[in-house]
Amino acid sequence: MIGVVLVLASLLSVGGQLCQKQATRPLTTGGRRRHLMLWLGLALICMGAAMVLWLLVLQTLPVGIAYPMLSLNFVWVTLAAWKIWHEQVPPRHWLGVALIISGIIILGSAA
């Protein structure tokens, strides 16, 4: 169960980061202030919820195990940027993602 909470905390944290990125995207039409406030508001909600879930995780897991699991954020952000904004991801970056996933698997099996 705590693994699900940890993944959800990670996804909400990433959601907050992606909302911040979206807030900075240029608009083709007016409404810049509304656009900015919407995405920054969503970012705050996501980040706040992530923090609450993170506190639940820290009550259960040792910080030495829990904190490295947040490396998943790098994986989620890379995948989202690639799919949502069609950002180029070089092979070296994909190798880093694979290494992060390997590290998470190794650390997760020790928990």
Swiss-Prot record:
Keywords attached to this Swiss-Prot or TrEMBL record, sorted alphabetically, are: Cell inner membrane, Cell membrane, Lipid A biosynthesis, Lipid biosynthesis, Lipid metabolism, Lipopolysaccharide biosynthesis, Membrane, Transmembrane, Transmembrane helix, Transport
Q: In which pathway does it act?
A: Bacterial outer membrane biogenesis; lipopolysaccharide biosynthesis
Q: Does the record's keyword annotation contain Lyase?
A: no
For this protein, the record's InterPro entries field holds: EamA_dom, Flippase_ArnE, Small_drug/metabolite_transptr
Q: GO cellular-component terms in the record? A: plasma membrane
Q: Which GO terms describe its biological process?
A: lipid A biosynthetic process; lipopolysaccharide biosynthetic process
Residue span, EamA domain: 40-109
- State which residue ranges cross the membrane: 38-58, 61-81, 91-111
Q: Which GO terms describe its molecular function?
A: carbohydrate derivative transmembrane transporter activity
The protein's topology relative to the membrane is:
Multi-pass membrane protein
Q: Which cysteines are joined by disulfide bonds?
A: none
Entry-linked Pfam families: EamA (PF00892)
Question: Can you say where in the cell this protein is located?
Answer: Cell inner membrane
UniProt entry tagged with the keyword Transmembrane: yes
Q: Which domain of life is it from?
A: Bacteria
Query: Which NCBIfam families does the record match to this protein?
Result: PRK15051.1
The annotated subunit structure for this chain is: Heterodimer of ArnE and ArnF.
Q: Which HAMAP family match?
A: Flippase_ArnE
Q: Which purpose does this protein serve, as stated in its record?
A: Translocates 4-amino-4-deoxy-L-arabinose-phosphoundecaprenol (alpha-L-Ara4N-phosphoundecaprenol) from the cytoplasmic to the periplasmic side of the inner membrane.
Family indicated by similarity: Belongs to the ArnE family.
What is this protein's record name?
A: Probable 4-amino-4-deoxy-L-arabinose-phosphoundecaprenol flippase subunit ArnE
Protein species of origin = Salmonella paratyphi B (strain ATCC BAA-1250 / SPB7)
Q: Lineage of this protein's species?
A: Bacteria, Pseudomonadati, Pseudomonadota, Gammaproteobacteria, Enterobacterales
